[in-house]
Amino acid sequence: MIPSPQVKAVAATLVFSALLLAGISASTPRGRAQEPGDDEGDSRIQRGFEIAPVPLNLEGKDRALVGLGSYLVTIDGCNDCHDNGPAQEFVPGHNPFFGQSPKKINPATYLGGGRDFGTISGPPSPHIISRNLTPSTKTGLPEGDHTFEDFVMIIRTGKDFDHLHPNCSATITTNCFPTNRPNPPVDGNLLQIMPWPNFQELTDHDLRAIYEYLRAIPCVQGNYPGEPADRCS
């Protein structure tokens, strides 16, 4: 199967993410929390607040973690995939790829998911849709009401708790990954497209910061199949 332009673009994004995360991981051993008075850590926290594209709810949250999380989520380009597509990623007239400045992220779609990456094993098979990472207004938990422990497992192992696209062998539909192709077949228990094999090298402290930041951003209502209709109500 010849890769589609979308898959090629995703591959380029994954390579960039791998290089970026290699630099982050090399400077901070896994599990090491930021030390008090760490100038580099303090500067990242401050920069995170400066570049946050949406208002942040800091009530009941660790401010330093939120700032660091904002920094990591922004430089890792999480919104490049976890929005509703290129046409809605930026506020009209503020798209840097069109030479428009200042750059301004569209808060109405920020990390709300819904980008369609197409199929990865040929039809019939499911389209991979990026997930909504914003928090539920009912529980305050981000990324589909997942706890921090769930979030760590997702990033470390790629486990798909939602199990949106199981494997199938008998009746093949557009919602499941067939077990007879490709060879080896796609594992329906794992997230596809999402570059978790790169992100799994993030430190425990970095993952805590990212999760805390996702708790602090505004809820964005999902608009794609499988997304709860009442996330923000």
Regions found by a protein language model. Give the residues of each.
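Electron-transfer interface patches adjacent to heme c in soluble/periplasmic c-type cytochromes
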Residues: 96-156, 160-164, 197-207
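Bacterial N-terminal signal peptides
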Residues: 12-23
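N-terminal secretory signal peptides that target proteins for export/translocation
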Residues: 1-9
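Electrostatic cytochrome c docking/interface patches
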Residues: 44-74
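The canonical Cys-X-X-Cys-His
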Residues: 69, 75-85, 122, 151, ...
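Detector for the c-type heme attachment site
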Residues: 81-87, 156, 195, 215-216
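Surface-exposed intrinsically disordered loops and tails
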Residues: 41, 45-51, 88-123, 162-185, ...
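Boundary at the C-terminal end of the N-terminal hydrophobic targeting segment
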Residues: 26-33
